[in-house]
Regions:
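Solenoid scaffold repeats with emphasis on beta-solenoid/beta-helix
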Residues: 39, 48-49, 58, 67, ...
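Short, basic/low-complexity N-terminal boundary segments at the transition from targeting/disordered tails
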Residues: 117-118, 140, 220, 230, ...
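Glycine-centered beta-turn/loop sites at beta-strand termini
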Residues: 42-43, 52-53, 61-62, 71, ...
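Extracellular interaction modules
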Residues: 168-176, 292-300, 383-386, 505-507
Length: 515
């Protein structure tokens, strides 16, 4: 900052009575209404440096120019006037007018009243019962790294801030503040307005609730929770295991590092929902309005939760995704990783993809899809014989080629043991109602030595098949795929948790689809 002059007060200092007269463009005066005697400092139209002393009450009129104003422990009265001023008043109960220009105001401790005036101003939060008026412009309330030590709430809608454990303040603390910037590690709760806000937070476990508008939100490290309204957002959740409640359009959202959850509530008026974490985008068809399918860009999210009734298609990525559908008919695909898929209510379609996945259809008639024998052995936790379907899709790793005419067999095999012949024609599904001789990994031991042959002892392979078995001592059934190559090629596709040997007799062809 280029300075035209430096004006320093020569008061009594240390709380003593101020001198009279002038010194270095300073003088004294007494305010009749407050009975406070001020040391007066006056600037010029050029950039000035105006510095008070000790405990003296200082009255500063900076004039135009980009001024530096510093006062200490007195109850000061500061007017920045025009220019981009830096005002630092330290302790004392101060009254500060920033004036026009982009000012930075640090009131220090004390019960201060700050009127930033026109311009894009920054007001630093300090100890004491302050009132901040940002005035015209795009103004920011800034929280320093050591300003707070316990959780704190800032409500831009009501103009109040207070310690989070306490009841909401009934008196407004500030007005005309659009942005919040924090360097603190304390946990903050921020409620913004429907306008354009910029929220930049530190390393605490923060909560941000947006009313809508065109906002930019950066939460930094910590386990943060961000709830968006209807509007256009740029969101960076930073490090930590974060949760984003989405209700936005035309936004760019970066989950950052950590295990992050995308939550979508149907109450925002969405008819259909499509989220692809692998291709990193999201789109909706809202009631009465359609979008082009690229409205929201997603990055580095691991989990998705749908709340309410909205028809959803959710596709995971290579991470270990946790995907939870809502109360409508959902299509959930895990893609890569060891995923957990939960359909919730509705008639859902679940495909774990690669990895060892856990699938729960929830209420409704659900379909569990398998596309490859090399994807890993999944677990279905709630398969219901009366309602649910196992679907097997032809591909190079789950070859069920042939007429596509399914042959379904439910029957007993007296002793399914090593060396047994089991006839499986193309697309044959066999549900065995007699127990296999071993449990647990022993099921694999037995099935991998079974030949799929003609049944005459020659072990001539005639096709691939799906085999459903259970052990007498186990409460679970297992679904295997047996290829044409003979013994040792059976691959476990999934475990049906809670489906017992007795339940296998109730399977029908309707429980299986080969596509």
């Amino acid at each position: 900052m280029g300075l035209s002059q430096i004006v320093t007060a020569c008061g009594g200092g240390g709380g003593s009575a101020p001198s009279t007269g002038t010194s270095n463009n300073s003088s004294t005066s007494t305010d009749a209404s407050s009975a406070i005697t001020y040391i007066e400092l006056e600037g010029t139209s050029a950039p000035d440096q105006l510095i008070g002393t000790g405990n003296d009450a200082t009255k500063v009129t900076a004039g135009e120019g980009d001024d530096y104003i510093l006062t200490f422990n007195g109850s000061d009265y500061i007017t920045g006037e025009a220019g981009n001023d830096l005002i630092w008043s330290n302790d004392g109960d101060d009254i500060i007018y920033g004036g026009a220009g982009n000012d930075i105001i640090d009131p220090g401790d004390g019960d201060d009243k700050i009127y930033a005036g026109a311009g894009d101003d920054t007001i630093k939060l300090s100890a004491g019962f302050d009132f901040e008026d940002g005035g015209e412009g795009n103004d920011t309330l800034e929280i320093g790294s050591s300003s707070l030590s316990i959780p704190f709430t800032i409500n831009l809608q009501t103009g109040r801030y207070f310690l989070t454990p306490q009841a909401n303040s009934q008196t407004a603390n500030f007005s005309s503040i659009e942005n919040v910037k924090s360097f603190a590690s304390v946990n903050l709760t921020i409620i913004d307005t429907i306008g354009t806000n910029i929220i930049t937070l530190g390393s605490g476990d923060d909560t941000v609730t947006s009313a809508g508008g065109n906002d930019t939100i950066s939460t930094g490290a910590g386990a943060d929770t961000v709830t968006l309204g209807l509007g256009s957002y740029v969101v960076d959740l930073g490090g930590g295991d974060d949760t984003l409640h989405l209700g936005a359009q035309k936004s760019m959202i970066d989950g950052g590092s950590g295990t992050d959850i995308l939550s979508v509530n149907a109450s925002i008026g969405v008819n259909t929902l499509y989220v692809d974490l692998d291709k990193e985008f999201y789109f909706t068809e809202e009631i009465g309005q359609s979008f082009d399918g690229q409205d929201i860009s997603l990055k580095d999210f691991e989990s998705v939760t749908v709340i309410g009734s909205v028809t959803s298609t959710i596709i995971g990525n290579s991470s270990a995704n946790i995907i939870t559908g809502g109360s409508s008919n959902d299509t959930l695909s895990g893609n890569g990783g060891n995923d957990t898929l939960s359909g919730g209510e509705g008639d859902d379609v679940l495909d774990g993809g690669a990895g060892t996945d856990t699938l729960s259809g929830g209420e409704g008639a659900d379909t569990f899809t398998f596309t490859s024998s090399s994807n890993g052995a999944d677990t279905i936790t709630d398969f219901t014989v009366a309602d649910d379907i196992l679907k097997f899709v032809d591909d190079t790793n789950l070859a069920l080629a042939g007429s596509k005419t399914e042959t379904f067999v439910v029957g007993a095999v007296a002793d399914l043991a090593a060396g047994s012949n089991l006839v499986t024609a193309a697309h044959n599904v066999m549900v065995l109602t007699s127990a296999v001789t071993n449990t647990g990994t022993g099921i694999h031991t037995e099935l991998t030595t079974i030949e799929t042959g003609a049944g005459d002892g020659s072990n001539t392979n005639v096709g691939n098949g799906i085999i459903v078995v259970a052990a007498a001592s186990s409460g679970d059934a297992k679904v295997w795929y047996d290829a044409v190559s003979g013994s040792g090629d059976a691959v476990e596709l999934t475990t049906l948790t809670g489906v017992s040997l007795a339940d296998l007799a109730n399977f029908t062809a309707d429980n299986f689809v080969i596509a």
